[in-house]
Each structure stands twice: as structure tokens, then as C-alpha cells.
């Protein structure tokens, strides 16, 4: 019997969302993604503490920022030994509103990978999908540095990323689901509001349809899943990045997975492109309470985890 994971791989590029790279081999993902929270989680495990300790030891007299960059590269390098494709490495969330420093950080990370013998074609630089982050991606893409736009919760963010020529976007599913479920409170009905009607699933479907309708080349990678149902409802999306626990559930399941998204079977096609000059971008994002709140919260959480990682490093000096 073919597993749900194997069926999914027929329609979609499967990506592992983890810093715990020892789990990668069993799921055979094409790519992998990391973020500050996942790296923080990994370095607190006994299996990965030696990577943190060695990185600090080798660069003890350098700045904490310098050490964090080397730590990210150390994890990315190990991950790339286990997958055939690309790894995503995230720019510090505290630079989310600073275009120039985001550009500089993206260039620095690519230089470090190249110094480690890894070509830029195997790296995606992750940036928050703020106006400033999108402008940074526009510059980096023109330099041959491919970008993965994260913390993406709305069509206007997706439209702006595509116009900027970003390589890939990561529209979040689970965090959108969380927001709407919390807003609904006791009125939420999983049978009615989940599955194909899940607001997070619908958001990715809308973005996928928009991109394919207007011929954008930017890849759509659904992210932030809470359940296997959210994943299988998006079978056919260009890529899906999935945590090890959900990869495990898909591997253990023999449920039939049917293709749900395809460029040939688009429904509810948009009539026109979204206006995305800076003023309209900011207004449309502000007008969508969920996207505004979740973007702000996501940046705060990633920034807080970056601070925790700095404290771990400083304690080892």
C-alpha cells in the first residue's frame, strides 16, 4: 500500500521544516527550511549542543551576531548533506523593517555558504514579507540570491512578492487557522470550518490560483501546518514544508491523497491583478486584521527567539 506521504510526493515537492536534521533521512524530502525558533529548539537538544559549543569556541572573540551567522551556516551545511535540494536560512527578524541591512545580511549569509563550498543555487534566504523585506528580496534576486518570503498571510503580500521577482513564498496555513478559530470561539465547528473550508487552506488556494492565472514564476510553498488534513487539502501546491511529526503521520497513513491544486483546474480565477505600490500595499495589509496581527506576532516571536539564542551563546563564552 502506498503511503500518504509517497502519494503527496507525486503532486508536490515535499520539504522538511526542522532544525533537527537527524530526522531528515527517513522522510527523503527534496528541500528543508529552518527558522530562528527551530534552530533555538535544536541547539538545546543534546544531539546538537556540540555544534553550538564548537561554533562559539571557534569564534569566541567575535560578536554574537557573527557567531549566530556561523551557527546558521553550520546547520544549513549539515542539512544539505542529507537532501538533494535547497535549504532556507532566515535573516534576523529584527531586520524586518530595514531593507538595506536585510540586503547586507542576505549577501553575508551567501558569502559564508560559498566559503563553505556550497553554491548559492542551493540556498534560499528567508525574509519577512514586510514592504521592506520584499524590497530587499527584489535587490537580492537581481544579484542571483534566491529568496523565500516568509510570514505571509495575505494575497497582497503574495502579489507584492511575485512582482518583486521572489523565488518562493511561504504562505502560512496553521497560524491563519489559529486566528480564525480563536475569533470564532464556541461558534467554531471543525466539521464545517475545517478541511476544504479551513481559512488557511483557502488562503493558499487563492494565492496559488492568483499566481497561476497571471503566469508568475514565484514558487508557492504552503507552510505552518497543524494537521495532515491541511496538507492533503493542498496536494498539488508547488511545494509544502512540513514538520517531522506531520511527515511521520503521513508516512504511517495509507489514506488516499488526491490532487487538489493544478494549473489546469483553477477555480474562482481573479479578474485583475492586485495594486501593490507602497501605499496600497500598506493599506490593504492594514485592512486585513488577521494578516496584520499575525505578521506582527510572527516577527516578535522570531525576534524573541533570536535574543534567547544570543543569551545561550553569551553564556558559553
From Swiss-Prot:
It catalyses: D-sedoheptulose 7-phosphate + D-glyceraldehyde 3-phosphate = D-erythrose 4-phosphate + beta-D-fructose 6-phosphate. Transmembrane segments: none annotated. InterPro entries: Aldolase_TIM (IPR013785), TAL/FSA (IPR001585), Transaldolase_1 (IPR004730), Transaldolase_AS (IPR018225). The active site is at residue 126. Pfam families: TAL_FSA. It comes from the Bacteria. GO terms for cellular component: cytoplasm. It is found in: Cytoplasm. Its EC number is 2.2.1.2. Keywords: Cytoplasm, Pentose shunt, Schiff base, Transferase. One of its GO terms (molecular function) is transaldolase activity. GO terms for biological process: carbohydrate metabolic process; pentose-phosphate shunt. Pathway: Carbohydrate degradation; pentose phosphate pathway; D-glyceraldehyde 3-phosphate and beta-D-fructose 6-phosphate from D-ribose 5-phosphate and D-xylulose 5-phosphate (non-oxidative stage): step 2/3. PROSITE patterns: TRANSALDOLASE_1, TRANSALDOLASE_2. Its main location: cytoplasm. Belongs to the transaldolase family. Type 1 subfamily. Transaldolase is important for the balance of metabolites in the pentose-phosphate pathway. Homodimer. This is Transaldolase. It comes from Burkholderia cenocepacia (strain HI2424). The gene is tal.
Amino acid at each position: 500500500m502506498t503511503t500518504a506521504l509517497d502519494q503527496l510526493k507525486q503532486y508536490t515537492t515535499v520539504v522538511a521544516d526542522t532544525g533537527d536534521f537527524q530526522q531528515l533521512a527517513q522522510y527523503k524530502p527534496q528541500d528543508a527550511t529552518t527558522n530562528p525558533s527551530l534552530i533555538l529548539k535544536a541547539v538545546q537538544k543534546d544531539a546538537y549542543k556540540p555544534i553550538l559549543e564548537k561554533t562559539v569556541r571557534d569564534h569566541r572573540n567575535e560578536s554574537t551576531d557573527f557567531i549566530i551567522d556561523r551557527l546558521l551556516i553550520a546547520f544549513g551545511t549539515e542539512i544539505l548533506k542529507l537532501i538533494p535540494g535547497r535549504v532556507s536560512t532566515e535573516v534576523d527578524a529584527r531586520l524586518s523593517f530595514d531593507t538595506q541591512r536585510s540586503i547586507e545580511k542576505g549577501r553575508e549569509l551567501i558569502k559564508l555558504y560559498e566559503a563553505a563550498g556550497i553554491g548559492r543555487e542551493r540556498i534560499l534566504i528567508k525574509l519577512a514579507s514586510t514592504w521592506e523585506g520584499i524590497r530587499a528580496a527584489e535587490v537580492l534576486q537581481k544579484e542571483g540570491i534566491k529568496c523565500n518570503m516568509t510570514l505571509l498571510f495575505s494575497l497582497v503580500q503574495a502579489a507584492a512578492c511575485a512582482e518583486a521577482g521572489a523565488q518562493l513564498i511561504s504562505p502560512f496555513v496553521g497560524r491563519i487557522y489559529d486566528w480564525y478559530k480563536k475569533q470564532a470561539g464556541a461558534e467554531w465547528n471543525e466539521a464545517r470550518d475545517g478541511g476544504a473550508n479551513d481559512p488557511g487552506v483557502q488562503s493558499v488556494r487563492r494565492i496559488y490560483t492568483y499566481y497561476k492565472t497571471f503566469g508568475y514564476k514565484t514558487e508557492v510553498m504552503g507552510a505552518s501546518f497543524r494537521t495532515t488534513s491541511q496538507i492533503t487539502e493542498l496536494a498539488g501546491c508547488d511545494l509544502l514544508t512540513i514538520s517531522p511529526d506531520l511527515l511521520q503521520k503521513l508516512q504511517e497513513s495509507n489514506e488516499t491523497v488526491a490532487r487538489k491544486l493544478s494549473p489546469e483546474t483553477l477555480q474562482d480565477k481573479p479578474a485583475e491583478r492586485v495594486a501593490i505600490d507602497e501605499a496600497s500595499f500598506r493599506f490593504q495589509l492594514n485592512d486585513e486584521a488577521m494578516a496584520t496581527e499575525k505578521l506582527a506576532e510572527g516577527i516578535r516571536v522570531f525576534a524573541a527567539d533570536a535574543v534567547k539564542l544570543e543569551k545561550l551563546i553569551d553564556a558559553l563564552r
